[in-house]
Amino acid sequence: MSQISQTALASLDESSRKDIMQFIESENSKSKVQMSIHNFTDMCFKKCNANKPITSGTLDSSEEQCLTNCLNRFLDTNIKVVQALQGAQK
């Protein structure tokens, strides 16, 4: 929101302000999801390829399985945390 001045927002009608704010919130959410995916992928890649030299442009079957399992565990954990937080809010 730092790139949109308060004066510019104030000059818009209420509907346009709401649309812009919803768009900004949506983009922020997308950015957070992309950052999480990047962080999980980076962490899992390092875990699954520790002390292994990269010898080709593709993963072998054990590396691929390790990455899949690692990412799935973190996604499952995130889902459980979100569900627990949603349950706590009720």
From Swiss-Prot:
Pfam families tied to this protein: zf-Tim10_DDP (PF02953)
Single GO term (MF): metal ion binding
GO cellular component: mitochondrial inner membrane; mitochondrial intermembrane space protein transporter complex
Motif, Twin CX3C motif: chain positions: 44-70
GO biological process terms, semicolon-separated: protein insertion into mitochondrial inner membrane
Keywords: Chaperone, Disulfide bond, Membrane, Metal-binding, Mitochondrion, Mitochondrion inner membrane, Protein transport, Translocation, Transport, Zinc
Xref: InterPro entries: Tim10-like, Tim10-like_dom_sf
Disulfide bridges in this chain: C44-C70, C48-C66
Taxonomic superkingdom: Eukaryota
Membrane protein topology class: Peripheral membrane protein
Cell compartments where the protein resides: Mitochondrion inner membrane
Annotated domain remarks: The twin CX3C motif contains 4 conserved Cys residues that form 2 disulfide bonds in the mitochondrial intermembrane space. However, during the transit of TIM8 from cytoplasm into mitochondrion, the Cys residues probably coordinate zinc, thereby preventing folding and allowing its transfer across mitochondrial outer membrane.
Subunit structure, interactors included: Heterohexamer; composed of 3 copies of TIM8 and 3 copies of TIM13, named soluble 70 kDa complex. Associates with the TIM22 complex, whose core is composed of TIM22 and TIM54. Interacts with the transmembrane regions of multi-pass transmembrane proteins in transit.
Known role: Mitochondrial intermembrane chaperone that participates in the import and insertion of some multi-pass transmembrane proteins into the mitochondrial inner membrane. Also required for the transfer of beta-barrel precursors from the TOM complex to the sorting and assembly machinery (SAM complex) of the outer membrane. Acts as a chaperone-like protein that protects the hydrophobic precursors from aggregation and guide them through the mitochondrial intermembrane space.
Family under the similarity heading: Belongs to the small Tim family.
Protein name as catalogued: Mitochondrial import inner membrane translocase subunit TIM8
Native source organism of the sequence: Debaryomyces hansenii (strain ATCC 36239 / CBS 767 / BCRC 21394 / JCM 1990 / NBRC 0083 / IGC 2968)
Gene field: TIM8
